[in-house]
Structure formats: structure tokens, C-alpha cells
Amino acid sequence: MNKFNYGIRIPIANNVVIPVNKIGRGDVVVFAYPENESVSFIKRIVALPGDTIEYRDKKLTINCQPVPKTPKGNDEYIENTPMGQVNMQPIVLEEKLGVHTYPVYQLPQAPTFSPQVVRPKVLQEAACQYEGNVAFTCKVPAGHYFAMGDNRDNSDDSRYWGFVPDKNIVGKAF
């Protein structure tokens, strides 16, 4: 991880004092988990401050522009359940966001997201509107980012716990 890629920060407050590079769409970053800042998370930044993000029927749109995806094939995906193992075949897509191209894994039979695990504070924020388990739209507030995992149907990310504050950014993953 490069702690200085996005700037030199003041310790403890974690405010940038000497900016270096800006966080870009598609960057993979390490950050302090907003619900427990002693835990580090690594996710892909898909939306920047001021962006409007829509995720509908597993299709990502940023500022009314669809994020390009092309099929790449299937990979084996195994998920443990209380009843044993279930073997499912995800669709592997190649997504292009900003200057980054990367694989995204989706399970065709899984919902777009699971509203029952969206944290109450996220549901109360006026920044996001949810439509059952098929779609949501969010306006990213100033000083925050929207992060998603590449394993889209099995990722604990901004869909569930909200935006990543800039002060929580630790650095860029290599």
C-alpha cells in the first residue's frame, strides 16, 4: 500500500496537508471501515464526491453514464452455508472505470443487493433512495467516496454501510 499516493496527512486527524494525487474512479484503496475505524478495508472507489451513482439490475451507472462491462467467462465460486457447500458459477465481467479495467464477479441468481442488511443510518440519509432489492441511487456528498467490492454479490461495501469519508483513506493499494 502506498500511504503517500493521495498526499501527506497529519497523524491522528488524518487531514491532507500536502496533496499529491487525487483519488480516481476505479482506484483500489485501503481505508478505515466507517463503522469501526480500527478495522482496515480494501475496496474499489466507484464514485467520487458530487457523483450520482445508480446500481440497477446489476448495472452500474455514474452520472447517467453506464460503466462499460464485457463478459469474460465463468469461474468456480464456492460459498459455505449452514447446510454445507453450495457450488455456483458466477459470471465474470470485465469492467472499465476511469483508467482501470478489472474483473467483476456476479452471481446471476443473487439480488442486486440485500436491503435487509443496509444499516439504518444509511436508510435515513437523504443521499440514497432504494427500490426493493433491484436498484438504488445515491448522490455522493462532498468529502466522501462510494466503494464497492469486485465480488459484487458477496461484498460488504458502501451499499450497506454508506460513504467512505476522505479522512478514513489510508492509501492506495498496489
Q: Can you describe what each PLM-predicted range is?
A:
Residues M1-F174:
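Soluble "head" domains of membrane/secretory-pathway proteins
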